[in-house]
Amino acid sequence: DRLRGTSKKGELTETIGFINGTSVTSTPTYNFLGAIQGRMPGLNIYRQGGDMPAAYGWKVRNSRTNLFLVDGIERDFYTMDPDQIESVQVLKDGLSTVMLGQRSAAGVINVITKKGNVGRPRFSFTAETGFEKALKLPDLLGAVDYITLVNEAYANDLREPGAYIEAYNPAIIEKYRNKENPYLYPDVDWYDELLNNTAPVHRYNFNVSGATNSFNYFVDLDWYRENGFFKTNDANSYNTNAQTNRFSVRSNLGVKVTSTTFMQINLAGRQERYNQPAAGTRSFYSNILTTRPNRYPVYNPDGSYGSYIDSKANQNLKGLLYDNGHQFKDSRHMSFDLTIKQKMDFLLDGLYLEATGSYYSATSYLTTRSKEFAAYLYKEDGSYQQVGEDKDQGNSGNKDQRYRITFLKGAVGYDHSFGKHKVAALFVADLNQIQDQNVQKGYLRNYTNYSGRMNYNYDDRYLAEAVYTRGGYNWLAPGNRWADYWGVGAAWNGHNESFVKELNIFSTLKPRISYAVTGQAICDYAEYKQSYGTSKVHLYGGPFDNKWTEENKTASRLNPEIAKKLNVGIDLGFLNDRLAFTFDYYQNRFSDVVATSEIKTAILGNVYPRSNCEKYSYTGTEMVLTWQDRIRNFNYFINGNLSFEQSKFEYSPQLPKAYPWMSRLGDPVGMTYGYVADGIFQSQEEIDAYDAFLPSAVKSTIMPGDIRYKDLNGDHIIDMHDQTNLGSKKAKGYYGISAGFNYRGFDFSVFAQGTLNRQVYLNGDFMDGSGKKGEGAITSYVLGRWTPDNHTNTHTRVWYGSNNNNRQTSSFWIYDADFFRLKNVEIGYTLPTLLTRKLGIPSVRIYAQGMNLLTVSEIFDVRKDIDPEIWGGSFPMTRTINFGISIKL
């Protein structure tokens, strides 16, 4: 292990969470993070928007940056095949990460890959097939309801009840209602037109492992295919669906070269093609929300694509899907790790040398083969007006990504016991060199560390550890590139004490404590240097012409951020560890946080450059409770984890605030700031009686059904002085619950996870009024809008044009969004060996898996058509059902 050498779990003083590899394979998703979401307290994994490959983000105890390691070496987590994983380590406290130097404050996940075990070769084959289904899609209104609301919004803006847009007069509405002519009066359900209800997924895996006295091996081959939800045109010679095809391979080989020399060679590769329509997957999900159902028909009577008169291009969504071409990104990832360990017992018992060299390369090439198509406006007289024109498919390509990591490490270690005393020492020098062609012109980033670690173990009872690192990063200014980080820890294996054994209560009793000073370098390349460029300026007495000007303000004093981390924990086991409990309390204090000050100066004429100007802290508790037992042939377990966290924004250079509620200091980190809503104006009399309004939304523009804001300072004006902390974007609590059993060949497992005290801000398309003058879709949620007959405080009125009052960031649009999600269920049956051995097969297991089967959330009380983790114009959260067979030889 790059960070520790080798240590048994019972000898650890750090706080490291472990997830077994079987927990990863039991979840039917190819995204590694999605498989471990909710399984570890302190590890927050959350769904992000975008296309399929960019689905998840993660933080460890709200880390500002993240680092993903495979066998202790930096990698891309998308390269992981679940069957390659032996275990997952989550490095939580500072003591476990100090040796990472200028990235030691990061949240760290370290995946340990499988190695061969002594014995004959073991072959394993797994085949899975299943399907995905979108959990939630916005419930969009049909044409009649849409037009009714648009007319109502139009009448509201005019303050003329019953007014309507001439194009949507009552006679026209009846034509829509009666579906008189779907070409002139279309009513299109774009989700139904573009998307299938389900999308198939397939996965096949083969691996072989084994070991002899001189070498061990593990070889894994994996193929995965995931289709998207888009409908396709069989007439096309190319695929326009959002589809992922991935092939990965790994070979881990350990060779005992001599009795004192061991060599580990790890090779891994992955090739993936992600195909999508030329317009991009995400654009369709977002464009559906901006296309009203009666904008144009999908097809005209003659079979051509429908369009509309003010269109300057062919924007027919079906045409964009079928006849706009496609694009695909080919990604290739390759890694090679070589480690040689040489025992030096002939010099000193327990002395060894270790050297590691590693190379990782990731490249991707984006090919776009787009074409254009003609669409037509169908007129009432039966004539057509062409929009756009047919053009042949083109072909363009470019390198989308080039990313390389070179890692070199040399280490001297010592591990020896003297009676009851065990001493271990590790001294490491390592270089991690990163080149990303997409970041800062591909300039090399060099992380250099010189580290030392000392461990002392007395009689497996008293454990102590100290670690020191001098870390450097070449993008900082020359005088600021190096920093010192250190940590200490201690633990007591109380269960090994004779007086504790006599109590016959604890099978494990291990309190532990650690404290570390860690850091992270956050800066751009040569941010400390002044750069210049040309721009047109007017000098006194001279012409308006190009001149050399300063491009940036230098950050010459930028230093690494500092994170001081304290962790106090205890591990308890009872009844021979059938009942186990772990508790941790942590306090992470971040100082010298890199940010841009809000203070501006007229003399400078610009904002200040980034500097180490902020401070904030996180404190939290984490708990894990497990019970596992066996009753004859019935084995079962239940596990629960729970974490709570509080944060505090402690310092930032701010302009003086007129009122205390305007300051961020003392607030939790990551808050939403805005106006405090005080209900809805229910009548004109309420508006007349109120005396505080926005300058951009004066009293005369306010109508019943608009939001009323609190005048916090009592100056009769709603402005910046009335903005305050509205709520947290981050959950304060996370939990996970798992249980399972196996009995006479049957096995079952279930896992659920959720959040506590979480809020979301629903604005934009989720507001009651379109504000787009009748363009864009409207959801069924808006049917509950405020009207003279529906005096609600949960919805505003609808509006047609702009609405400066209701569109302000305010507490009105913030909702509780805690959720409980049945994340994974798996049921399997292993055929009797008496049956399978007749076929020459030692083990055959058939199984079914389900992912995201049930979700319960407070947000459903507000909107039933959105998922609490992701919504709107992004690739939706999906439910997956898988069926599989596993054969072991």
What are these language model-derived features?
Residues 297-304, 319, 755-845, 850:
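Extracytoplasmic gating/loop element in the C-terminal half of outer-membrane beta-barrel translocons
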Residues 1-249, 263, 703, 713, ...:
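Short, small/polar-rich motifs associated with maturation and membrane association
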Residues 124-181, 279-280, 527, 614, ...:
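Conserved small-residue
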Residues 134-136, 183-222, 226-230, 240-315, ...:
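Flexible loop and strand-edge segments within Gram-negative outer membrane beta-barrel domains
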Residues 252-260, 266-271, 286, 310-370, ...:
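Extracellular/periplasmic, surface-exposed regions of secreted and cell-surface proteins
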Residues 728-761:
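Glycine-rich, aromatic-lined ligand/substrate-binding cores of catalytic
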Residues 608-617, 656-672, 721, 725-740, ...:
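C-terminal extracellular loops and terminal segments
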